[in-house]
Each structure stands twice: as C-alpha cells, then as structure tokens.
Regions:
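Helix-turn-helix repeat elements of alpha-solenoid scaffolds
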Residues: 203-210, 242-248
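Conserved redox-active cysteine motifs that mediate thiol-disulfide chemistry
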Residues: 307-308, 312-329
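Bacterial Sec-dependent N-terminal signal peptides
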Residues: 1-32, 419-421
Length: 421
C-alpha cells in the first residue's frame, strides 16, 4: 500500500512513444546491467498488458541481460523485476521498443535508471525530466508523510488493520477469500484508511488533477503516438487518472485516423465502445467465445430472449469466485422462469485452473473462455483492471444492474418475472 501515493508518479509519468507504424517486423535488442541488487530474472511485457499475461522471462547472468524482440510498430514496454512482481508491489522500467538497440543501466533506486536508444527513448527521457522537474517537489512531501504514517502504523484504519491481522492468521483459502472480500468493501467506501491517510489521499488527488491538465496540454500540442499512449493509459485507469472521458472521446478519432493500424486503435475502440454501452439502461455487447470443449458460442444465442446475468470471472480471482458461488441459489430458483447465467473466465496460458474451479464449485451454467484477453472482453465491458464483474440484463438485452449482489439479483428477478410465470 506504500505505492498508494508513490503510484502517483508512476501513473503521471507515463511512457512516451513517437514514431510512425510499420507493417513489417523489425528487431529491437535490449542490453543492460543491473547495479546494487540481486535479481536473476526480469519480466518483459507490453505496457498495455496485465503483468499476469503474456510475460516473457529474461534471465540475468552476472548482473547483465540481453534479449531481442520483434515488433511491428513502436510501442511502450515495461521491464519488471520478478521478485517485485511476486511481492505484489513493483515499479516498472518503462521504455519504448523501437528498431535497433536499447541500453539499460538499472539501479536499486529506480530514479537512477538510465535508458538510451534511438529517438523515442530520448523523447521519453526529455518528457520525464520536464515532468519531474515540475511535479516532484510537490509529490515528495506527500511521499514522506505517507512513509511516516506507515512507520507509526497509522496509515490504515482500525477496521482494516483488524482484517489484515485476521488474514495473516487465516488457515484456509475460503477464509482468506472471505476476508479479502471484506477488505475490498472497506476500500470501496474509503474506510480502509485512517483520517490522516484520507487527507493525504485527497492532496494526492488534487496533485494528479493538476498533472492531468498539464499532460492534456501536451497531448493537444503534440498529436503523436506519445499522446495516443497517454489517452489509452488514461482510459485504462479512468477512475484514478482523473481524465475527462469526453475529452478522450473527442481526441480519439484524430489519433485513430492518423494511426489506423496501431494496436492502440483497436484497444481504445473496444474500451470506448464498452464505456458507451455498458451502463444501466445500456445494451450488452455481443461476442463469441469457446467453451472448455472448444465449441464456440455466441452470447446472444445463449441468452435467447431470457433475463440473464453475464458473469465475468477468473480462477485466480477470489472475490469473483465468491460472487459466482453466491449466484447458484438464485440461478436454481429462477432458471425455469426465464433466467440464465453465462460465465466467462479470463485465464492465463491454459484452462487447467478454470476447469478445476468449475469442478469444485459445481457452477451449473455454461462457462466460456477468454484466454489471455485475446478478444478484449474485459475492455469492452469496462473491467480492464479487475478480475471480473457481473451484468444483469432483461429479456431485451437492456442492462438492469452492474455488479449486483445475489440478493439484489433475486429482488429484481422476483419483481420482473412475477407476472410472467
């Protein structure tokens, strides 16, 4: 949680990409040395990917590494120290994958890192220098205050500290899942923090708003892939970025027209489509996915004019599984009255854990597979940065509720279906 404020800089100092796209692959070679830390593995990923997906492991030998990737167009990538990712708190090394060689000097203090390459990484360095010169003097005092709260064990609220203690002593997975769900409830209401931590969070929000205004001035004055990446990053982290969705929407056609073949164009199209459609009163977005046997199903065919719950989940997401489990009695109660559930699991590399979880939980409805986020379903449904979500629809495909609990689903179905059956 120390990154709660420190992530301020990580989010504000986004990656910079500046070049035209190419339709053929070119080589990008990464060469680097690591100083003042014992690390044996780096994780390479696109900056737009979840670190749990599409990882490439780069071995570190004698404090040095070298790796070559093939790219179709300049794009922001990240290097993450494996041990940091495993701890659950990491600061990625952001760079621009471009044709040629990129050199890295990586230190235990990330602020000392040096990245040199061709034009794009020079632009990145200049942008970050200007940005940090403006905002670091304002951000550092917030970081120091947060550190002081942690040292005095005064960052979290009493309720949150109690749950953390119980989680540390929980003996089984089911208990841990229940405790994590309670902790998430506290976070959603802001009651996970002490009063002083809440005040510092408000100051951080104000600073981020100022940084966002500065960044959008840069975007407007520099309509390049630099700005395109900023738009995408803000859309992915819309709640925390404090970006204006209408401003993003108005700028997107400019960039999509200029870079129609860039990967960012399709990602943003899917996310903006979901933002417009996926809301109470909006309509579901149709898709086709395979089940565990490989048979492809279209969502609209599964729903077939019924009231339906779309359940996006993952075998590694405890709160998602708890939500899915809670819906089983509701499904059994209303399945013969015009209600169905369609599960979609976001899985990594393979479906082994999904298959095992379904067998354990005995989910009685169909479950489809979104493997490695290939179809952008989470983007389309506005849950890019979470394990999943649920969406209740009526028999015409209109969304009635987003992330309702089981009792809310039962309440809505009881009202809507009482005169039908």
């Amino acid at each position: 949680m120390k990154k709660h404020i420190r992530v301020l800089l990580a989010l504000m100092v986004s990656g910079v990409v500046l070049a035209s796209c190419t339709t053929r692959e070119v080589s990008c070679t990464l060469k680097g040395r690591i100083h003042d830390r014992n690390s044996d593995t780096l994780i390479l990923k696109r900056a737009t990917d979840d670190p749990r997906f599409n990882q490439v492991l780069i071995p570190v030998r004698d404090s040095a590494f070298e790796f070559t990737i093939q790219i179709y167009h300049p794009e922001a990538y990240e290097l993450i120290f494996k041990e940091e990712l495993e701890r659950g708190s990491w600061r990625p090394v952001l760079f621009i994958a471009e044709k040629g060689e990129i050199s890295f000097e990586l230190y235990s203090n990330p602020d000392e890192n040096k990245i040199t390459g061709r034009n794009l990484n020079s632009v990145l360095a200049e942008y970050n220098k200007e940005f940090l010169g403006m905002f670091r003097p304002k951000a550092d005092p917030l970081n120091d205050s947060i550190d002081a709260l942690f040292q005095k064990n005064e960052y979290f609220s009493a309720e949150m500290k109690l749950l953390q203690s119980e989680l540390a002593n929980a003996g089984d997975n089911e208990s841990r899942m229940a405790l994590r769900e309670k902790m998430e409830d506290l976070r959603s209401t802001g009651n996970d923090l002490s009063p002083r931590a809440k005040d510092l969070t408000r100051q951080g929000d104000s600073l981020r708003a100022e940084a966002t205004r500065w960044r959008y001035k840069y975007i407007e004055e520099n309509p390049s892939i630099v700005s395109y990446y900023f738009l995408l990053n803000d859309l992915r982290y819309l709640e925390s970025s404090q970006a204006n969705i209408e401003e993003i929407k108005s700028l997107y056609p400019v960039f999509a027209g200029k870079y129609p073949e860039h990967a960012y164009t399709e990602i943003m199209r899917s996310m903006l489509e979901g933002h417009d459609a996926i809301k109470v009163g909006g309509s579901f977005i149709d898709f086709s996915l395979p089940d565990l046997d490989g048979t492809v199903h279209r969502l609209s065919d599964i729903i077939g004019g019924k009231y339906a719950l779309i359940d996006l989940w993952a075998s590694w997401c405890g709160p998602c599984i708890a939500t899915s489990r809670s819906m089983i009695p509701v499904y059994e109660e209303f399945r013969d009255r015009g209600f169905t559930v369609c599960g979609v699991a976001a899985e990594i590399d393979n479906t082994d854990q999904m298959r095992a979880r379904i067998e354990k939980e005995k989910f009685p409805w169909i479950n489809l597979v979104e493997l490695d986020h290939k179809n952008h379903i989470w983007d389309k449904y506005g849950v890019s940065n979470s394990g999943g979500g649920t969406f209740l629809m009526d028999n015409e495909g209109t969304i009635l509720a987003i992330n309702p609990d089981a009792e809310k689903v039962r309440e809505i179905l009881s009202e809507k279906l009482k005169q039908t059956f």
